[in-house]
């Protein structure tokens, strides 16, 4: 799609937004219902596209993308009317005989730039929030998941007028053309370097942005943890989508006292989940493309492999791999892995573990396995990270009742459920004041008696 076509799409959506059609709550709900029905109708196509792009099994496709997206859309449908109503606020004495309220209004013409690793979930969830809030939307899916992008375009073309929602496929040229346009809101999910570029381009028009980025999310296991449960949940979170998950445990920090037992249990769980030959397992996915495959494989140090390590370039598959005895200056610790490699480091004290994490860029997620509530609270309260779990991994994403987002280097802003609606809304504060009483204290000319009254009310 060329620059002129993109400019026309944005212009058409801006003209449509100015008709105020998206302000009607029933119209928003109807749009969400159409989206839900289109996703349901295309479930086989979605599953096939995910198998093509990422090798995902149908079970994983439904659990992590189709079903989760439908749940979020259903949540938005159920609550959009209540969220859209004005919210009454208390009035102080300065605004006596007034009604004070906040009114959520849509930003306008919005851009959603989606990633390739969960191409439906990470497109449909922000889309549902944007529609619930009353915006028009241009979606730019990733060129690295072409089969999924094509199905997304088909879903949106069937469900929406292009003046409301349009999908723009393509690569870097289309990204550049889109970022040259003036948007009222940009929602980006992807890498930290690209997120910085998006924010820089958005700043030229002072466009607000939500950035869902990534980072090296730590998983801490102390000596009190239920190791069997920890092993199963770590294996699930790490090797789901073959590690291509923004909140996957990136590395393991384990107390030296339980190191050997925990690694033995994780190895057992990997074999139980994927078999003795995971590269032959049809339900075990593949790396998205050859470039990413080469990068991830290059992070494997053969001298530190204690599980897996084998890669098959023809199918873009890499075994679930554990690296033990990893040092902080190893290559695998210098970047987000985004693949099926789990580096293992040890600590002697909680102070050592906390310092190791806080000396690095703020991660998107953190996971602490411990039966000690004081330890749990220490990491939850005092270590900066976007969100996380106690005695589990990645499940803080699987709800519409809490927001999800990063901080610092892992992003800004939140979405899911109410937070999605708020992310795509501007809150207007309105004072509606009666005219039957007009207190004179604030008006010039000022006098000492007026000043006394003002001090009674404002102090």
Question: Predicted segment positions?
Answer:
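N-terminal Rossmann-like NAD(P)+-binding subdomain of aldehyde/semialdehyde dehydrogenases
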Residues: 1-101
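Residues at or immediately preceding the N-termini of alpha-helices
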Residues: 6, 25, 43, 227, ...
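Structural signal for hydrophobic packing residues in well-ordered secondary-structure cores
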Residues: 17, 21, 36-39, 43, ...
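Conserved C-terminal structural/oligomerization subdomain of aldehyde/semialdehyde dehydrogenase
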Residues: 220, 271, 317-459
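Residue-level signal for inorganic ion chemistry
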Residues: 28, 73, 134, 165, ...
């Amino acid at each position: 799609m060329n620059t002129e076509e993109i400019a026309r799409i944005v212009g058409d959506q801006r003209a449509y937004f100015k008709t105020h059609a998206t302000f009607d709550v029933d119209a928003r709900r109807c749009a969400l219902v159409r989206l839900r029905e289109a996703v349901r109708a295309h479930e086989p196509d979605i599953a096939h596209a995910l198998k093509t792009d990422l090798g995902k099994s149908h079970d994983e496709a439904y659990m992590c993308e189709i079903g989760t997206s439908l749940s979020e859309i259903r949540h938005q449908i159920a609550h959009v009317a209540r969220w859209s109503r004005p919210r009454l606020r208390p009035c102080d004495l300065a605004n006596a005989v007034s009604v004070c309220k906040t009114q959520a209004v849509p930003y306008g013409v919005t851009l959603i730039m989606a990633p390739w690793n969960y191409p439906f979930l990470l497109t449909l969830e922000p889309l549902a929030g944007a529609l619930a809030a009353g915006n028009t939307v241009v979606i730019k899916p990733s060129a690295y998941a072409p089969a999924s992008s094509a199905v997304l375009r088909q879903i949106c073309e069937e469900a929406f007028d292009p003046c409301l929602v349009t999908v723009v496929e393509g690569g870097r040229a289309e990204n550049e053309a889109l970022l040259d346009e003036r948007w009222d809101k940009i929602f980006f999910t992807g890498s930290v370097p690209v997120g910085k570029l998006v924010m820089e381009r958005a700043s030229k028009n002072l466009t607000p942005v939500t950035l869902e980025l990534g980072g090296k999310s730590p998983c801490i296991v102390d000596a009190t943890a239920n190791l069997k449960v920890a092993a199963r949940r770590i294996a699930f979170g790490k090797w789901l989508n073959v590690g291509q998950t923004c909140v996957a445990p990136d590395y393991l920090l384990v107390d030296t006292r339980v190191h050997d037992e925990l690694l033995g249990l994780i190895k057992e769980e990997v074999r139980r989940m994927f078999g003795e030959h995971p590269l032959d397992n049809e339900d075990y996915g593949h790396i998205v493309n050859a470039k990413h495959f080469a990068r991830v494989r290059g992070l494997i140090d053969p001298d530190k492999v204690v599980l897996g390590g084998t890669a098959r370039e023809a199918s873009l598959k890499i075994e679930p791999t554990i690296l033990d005895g990893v040092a902080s200056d190893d290559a695998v610790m210098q970047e987000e892995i985004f693949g099926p490699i789990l580096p293992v480091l040890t600590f002697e004290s909680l102070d050592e573990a906390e310092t190791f994490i806080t000396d690095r860029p703020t991660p998107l997620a953190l996971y602490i396995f411990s039966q000690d509530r004081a330890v749990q609270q220490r990491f939850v309260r005092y270590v900066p990270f976007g969100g996380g779990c106690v005695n589990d991994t990645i499940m803080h994403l699987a709800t519409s009742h809490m927001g999800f987002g990063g901080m610092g280097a892992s992003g800004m802003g939140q979405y899911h459920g109410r937070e999605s609606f708020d992310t795509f809304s501007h809150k207007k504060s309105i004072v509606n004041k009666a005219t039957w009483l007009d207190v004179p204290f604030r008006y010039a000319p000022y006098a000492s008696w007026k000043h006394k009254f003002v001090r009674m009310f404002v102090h």
